[in-house]
């Protein structure tokens, strides 16, 4: 029995308030949620999986773009209608604390992105009848391996936050205002948490921060991602994946570290945002000298087996049909494995909010659909190349009715990419060799087989 199970089973908890936590938004928000759950359980609160039976409902909100805000507000209003005592946490709380407290009387507390570690004290104050505004403008906190954490992901998968905040100022992005400046964890702290997760049986470790490739710059005076990759390569976890790499941060030193670390997956998440120099310049992104083309070509040469994921924004202010055609040609030329496409969301407080030549919403949606249609064909072609190959698959779910497994190969990251549907023997949380028998645009299908000679469990 682990510490959480022990805490949840003690009789004293029967008198403690029950708390449910709803997580919205990205993986960074998920880690905050997991730390709040861990702190609450350690303090003796009953953590419920269902908000209906909870005394308090904590909603860890997202405020990255308009659609995320709408989802967060909709969730809060549904709970308010039910008469729940709500604690609003996360990015929406950081962004709009006064408005939320004014408009949602059911909110007994509000907790900012730099204050989630005080969740126990916040609830204690709310229990005494205080309406709590725990939002600080001093965004300098980052949890380490000593802070209790209860993972909400599938058992074999864990996110590992290496840094928090961002020092870049992309003209469309509100994140630096919501999360503060970059603050990296020491390598030793990250390695200790990785060892803890390995001891829990984690099979896939996913490195995250706002700009993962800038890891260590604030702490050591220079990026230390290459050193971190090599150090994590010594941890007994079969798969290590990295998300949120800034294009110019994939330096030759980082590429060399990836090449030399067998359990580091050949999967690169590079949010490029656009291809046309004029739009990139307006976004305050790297834009000179075909920087993105050169990067992709260099990566294809150095890491020919690498899976490339990227994301783009369409409908940025001033984007013309010529600019958009440039983006279509860029995607066609580079044949990315996975692409996410967002329509520009004007965020108050960012430079792009005031730019002229705002693109009409219907045109944004049309361009998004055209780009996604192009990428669907590319993704299907990429997936069809997998048919006949034997690849490692991490089994994450089982369909009890059919006996079919649902898992992922190294080419698929959780939540954002596809899955592999697997038939054959296996166990939950295990890695198995699977021969791919069929492909769809976003998913694969296969059968468990014997591992061939020289089989790579990281898919290299």
UniProtKB/Swiss-Prot annotation:
GO terms for biological process: tRNA modification. PANTHER family: RIBOSOMAL PROTEIN S12 METHYLTHIOTRANSFERASE RIMO (PTHR43837), RIBOSOMAL PROTEIN US12 METHYLTHIOTRANSFERASE RIMO (PTHR43837:SF1). Binds 2 [4Fe-4S] clusters. One cluster is coordinated with 3 cysteines and an exchangeable S-adenosyl-L-methionine. Disulfide bonds: none annotated. [4Fe-4S] cluster 2 binds at residues 166, 170, 173. Its EC number is 2.8.4.4. The lineage of its organism: Bacteria, Bacillati, Cyanobacteriota, Cyanophyceae, Synechococcales. It comes from Synechococcus sp. (strain JA-3-3Ab). This is Ribosomal protein uS12 methylthiotransferase RimO. It comes from the Bacteria. It catalyses: L-aspartate(89)-[ribosomal protein uS12]-hydrogen + (sulfur carrier)-SH + AH2 + 2 S-adenosyl-L-methionine = 3-methylsulfanyl-L-aspartate(89)-[ribosomal protein uS12]-hydrogen + (sulfur carrier)-H + 5'-deoxyadenosine + L-methionine + A + S-adenosyl-L-homocysteine + 2 H(+). Its main location: cytoplasm. It is found in: Cytoplasm. NCBIfam families: 30S ribosomal protein S12 methylthiotransferase RimO, MiaB/RimO family radical SAM methylthiotransferase. Residues 384-450 form the TRAM domain. Keywords: 4Fe-4S, Cytoplasm, Iron, Iron-sulfur, Metal-binding, S-adenosyl-L-methionine, Transferase. One of its GO terms (molecular function) is metal ion binding. Its cofactor is [4Fe-4S] cluster. Belongs to the methylthiotransferase family. RimO subfamily.
